[in-house]
């Protein structure tokens, strides 16, 4: 089973550090907008949360991702569940970086506005904290995963086909040239190549 950029889209709770970890709730501000409140401390505090963090630090609590993954693994009795996504190794790492770098909104395949704006009209996503999921059997970058499954050979084939037909290229030759360029984007360590690919294997 393959899940490409799925877990980061699943619903999550939001924890905010304000002298201790509190869950962020959303309330109607009374003027047609929504506001955040922090009414209660998290008790018990989830084990993934660091004991201390900078004031205002935020992290996602991703029970939805864990629930989906548990269900997927039950369905795949012999095979593997493969997840490709924005991810960080630990929840503590998310707490230590600006939260707007991991909590993002999208509308029409472009970045959206503030996460409390336009409910229902934009997607809210969060980097996946790997330590909140069951421990995977294999973790690779997307670049490593694609190289493991032969992308370098496909690129070499594309280069040869383009070189052979470059003088009078047809649609097939142009597709081979596109293969080379697409691979560069997929393997870019500063971009898509840095995606995390995690695998849970059932024998």
Where are these regions (language model features)?
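Long, Lys/Arg- and hydrophobic-enriched amphipathic alpha-helices
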Residues: 45-203
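A mobile, often basic/glycine-rich helix-loop segment
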Residues: 2-50, 96-107
């Amino acid at each position: 089973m393959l899940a490409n950029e799925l877990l980061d889209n699943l619903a999550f709770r939001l924890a905010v550090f304000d002298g201790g970890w509190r869950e962020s709730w959303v309330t109607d501000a009374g003027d047609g907008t929504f506001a955040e409140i922090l009414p209660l401390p998290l008790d018990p505090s989830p084990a993934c949360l660091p004991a201390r963090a900078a004031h205002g630090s935020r992290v996602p609590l991703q029970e939805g991702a864990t629930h989906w993954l548990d269900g997927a693994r039950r369905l795949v009795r012999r095979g593997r569940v493969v997840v490709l996504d924005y991810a960080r190794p630990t929840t503590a790492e998310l707490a230590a970086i600006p939260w707007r770098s991991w909590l993002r909104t999208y509308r029409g395949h472009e970045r959206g506005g503030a996460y409390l704006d336009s409910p229902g009209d934009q997607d809210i996503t969060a980097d996946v904290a790997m330590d909140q999921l069951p421990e995977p059997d294999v973790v690779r970058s997307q670049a490593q995963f694609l190289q493991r499954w032969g992308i370098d050979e496909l690129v070499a084939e594309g280069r040869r086909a383009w070189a052979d037909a470059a003088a009078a290229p047809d649609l097939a030759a142009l597709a081979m040239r596109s293969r080379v360029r697409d691979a560069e984007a997929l393997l870019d360590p500063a971009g898509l190549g840095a995606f995390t690919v995690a695998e849970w294997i059932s024998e």
